[in-house]
Amino acid sequence: MMKISLEFPKSETRLAGFPYGETVYKEQVKNIISFDGDIEIIFPNQIEKVASSFVQGFFSGIVAVIGYKGVEEQIKIVSRNDNLTASIRKNM
């Protein structure tokens, strides 16, 4: 399983905005991701809330390659708690 740990400034606890999500994907994920197997995307513990706009922007590049079904089957989300993880997955 490929593991990708996202990085944000320590003071950043909430993520929002479609363009910001796209930027994070392009800068931290796009050049290293391989869709050949399962992928674990790890949000740092300081992240408390992730808006649907960020989720949609971040995952738009992934969905374009493997589709929503591929995201459901291949992508595992790890965050500070199960509620946040469920929220991120729901907002894809």
Model-derived features with residue positions:
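Domain-start "cap" segments at the beginnings of catalytic or binding domains
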Residues: M1-T13
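Amphipathic alpha-helical interaction surfaces in cytosolic regulatory modules
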Residues: S11-Q28, S34-G37, F43-R89
